[in-house]
Amino acid sequence: MRIAVVIPCYNVEKYVEDAVRSVWSQEGVEPDVVAVDDGSTDATPRILEQLVAERPHHLRVLSQPNRGANAARNAGLAETSGEYVQFLDADDRLLSGKLARQAALAVRSGRPVMVVGAYRKCWPDGRTQEVLPSGDDAWSAWVGLQLGTTSANLWQREALQAAGGWKEDQASSQDYELAHRLFIHGGTIVMDDTLGTIVNRRPHGSISAGDTVGNMERYILLRARVKEHLEALHSAVHVQLIARLKQQMFM
């Protein structure tokens, strides 16, 4: 199976080389790797140039004005090939065997829209936390906030493109916004509970982290859309999920 790896990059001079090399060290796969420089103002472009010079057939670099991570992901998606796509944030890294294992799991599981992976969160002060996925199906995992995180998962290209890709103006809840569109069209998932990704929590956080009101509004509106969809299905299977969504929305 052909796998694409898209690495959005913005001012990640301390991390990006480790991210790229973690992809190069994957065994059993030869991914199509594209790094998208999203208008970096630090040494990120120079480091990417050096990596391309080192292995020109194993990395391509796209450059664009700063438009945000989702726009960079979509740009990389459009320029790569592969049945499944790994979106790797440039401050994260993959552990050995992650791509081959999840690709094989996808084949065995009937090619779901997403392989949900386990990961380890690491903070600058040395704290760590391992996060394992769980859930009986796509919607229960969505409602239970058990859909991994961007870098831990493997995404089916055809489903991504059919859903319209990443929503570029979505400032928070980005993974869950995309997943809800995939699942509305009947997408299924499979869980990979083997640790496959290191997710680094950068000390300065993200732009959206300080927008508490906006984040809460997006959180509630997204759950309202999912509740409406599940209610329209008129299935007893979803009664408990709908009740849980109402609790999350403070209803």
Residue locations for each model-derived region?
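Acidic helix N-cap motif at the loop->helix transition within catalytic regions
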Residues: K14-E17, D42-L51, R93, G97
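Short, acidic, metal-binding catalytic loop of nucleotide-sugar glycosyltransferases
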Residues: R21-E30
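A conserved acidic beta->alpha catalytic loop
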Residues: S22, D37-R46, P65, D89
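Glycine-rich, basic loop-to-helix element that forms the pyrophosphate-binding segment
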Residues: Q64-T80
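Short aromatic/hydrophobic "clamp" motif used to bind/position activated sugar donors
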Residues: V85
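Acidic metal-phosphate-binding loop of nucleotide-sugar-dependent transferases
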Residues: D92-R93, Q170
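Conserved donor NDP-sugar-binding/catalytic core segment of glycosyltransferases
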Residues: G97-Q129
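Conserved nucleotide-sugar donor-binding catalytic segment
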Residues: G117, G135-Y219
